[in-house]
C-alpha cells in the first residue's frame, strides 16, 4: 500500500479538478499505536478533499503543516478558511495564508463533519495503525478514492457513479 498509493496519487493529480479558494478544515481522531492521534482534513467548497495530515499532537505546528503541504501540492492559497473554534488554527494560518479570511463556526463545518464519517467507517474495522506514516498514507489514499468516487476528476465527471472506480483504476494503473 505504501508503495503504490503515492504512485496512484501522482498519476491522478494531473486529472484532478482545480481546487477551490474556500476551504473547510477540521480534525478527527484515529488510533495510532494504541493511542488517539489527530487526522487533519481540508476540503474545498465543492467537497473535494484538498489534503489530509495525521499528527500525534493537536498543535498549531501540525495545522500549519497541513496548510503548507496543501498549498504546495495544489498551488492554491485559500481566500477563506472555515474552522471550528480550536485555538491551534489562528496561529497556523498566519504564516502560510496571512490574507485569508478566517471564520470560526461549528455549524459552517457540518459538511466536513459529515465527511469524517466516511473515513471513520473505513477505519473502524482496521482498529488503528502502528505508525504515523501508515495512517497518513492510508488517509491520503482514502481521500484519492473519495474524490474519484464523487466525480471530482476529469476522468470520472461523465461516468455514472456506480462505474467510476471500475473505469478509472485501469487508466491509473497504466499511468504507473
Regions found by a protein language model. Give the residues of each.
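Active-site beta-loop-alpha junctions of metal-dependent nucleic acid enzymes
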Residues: 3, 52-75
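Two-metal-ion RNase H-like nuclease active-site motif
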Residues: 19-32
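RNase H-like two-metal-ion nuclease catalytic core shared by retroviral integrases
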Residues: 105-124, 135
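Mobile genetic element proteins and their domesticated derivatives, centered on retroelements
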Residues: 26, 42, 47, 67, ...
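C-terminal domain-tail junction helix/linker
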Residues: 125, 134-176
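Acidic/histidine-rich, metal-coordinating catalytic segments
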Residues: 78-89, 93, 106
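Short, basic alpha-helical nucleic acid-contact segments in DNA-binding proteins
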Residues: 1-21
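Short conserved beta-strand segments at catalytic cores or DNA/RNA-binding microdomains
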Residues: 33-49, 59, 67
Amino acid at each position: 500500500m505504501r508503495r503504490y498509493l503515492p504512485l496512484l496519487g501522482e498519476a491522478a493529480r494531473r486529472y484532478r479538478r482545480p481546487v477551490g479558494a474556500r476551504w473547510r478544515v477540521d480534525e478527527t481522531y484515529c488510533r495510532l499505536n494504541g493511542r488517539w492521534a489527530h487526522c487533519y482534513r481540508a476540503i474545498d467548497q465543492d467537497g473535494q478533499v484538498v489534503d489530509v495530515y495525521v499528527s500525534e499532537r493537536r498543535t498549531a505546528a501540525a495545522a500549519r503543516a497541513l496548510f503548507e503541504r496543501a498549498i504546495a501540492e495544489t498551488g492554491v492559497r485559500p481566500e477563506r478558511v472555515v474552522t471550528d473554534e480550536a485555538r491551534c488554527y489562528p496561529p497556523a494560518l498566519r504564516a502560510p495564508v496571512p490574507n485569508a479570511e478566517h471564520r470560526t463556526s461549528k455549524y459552517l463545518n457540518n459538511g466536513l463533519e459529515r465527511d469524517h464519517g466516511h473515513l471513520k467507517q473505513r477505519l473502524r474495522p482496521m482498529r488503528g495503525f502502528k505508525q504515523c506514516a501508515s495512517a497518513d498514507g492510508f488517509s491520503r489514499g482514502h481521500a484519492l478514492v473519495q474524490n474519484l468516487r464523487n466525480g471530482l476528476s476529469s476522468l470520472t465527471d461523465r461516468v455514472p457513479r456506480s462505474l467510476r472506480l471500475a473505469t478509472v483504476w485501469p487508466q491509473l494503473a497504466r499511468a504507473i
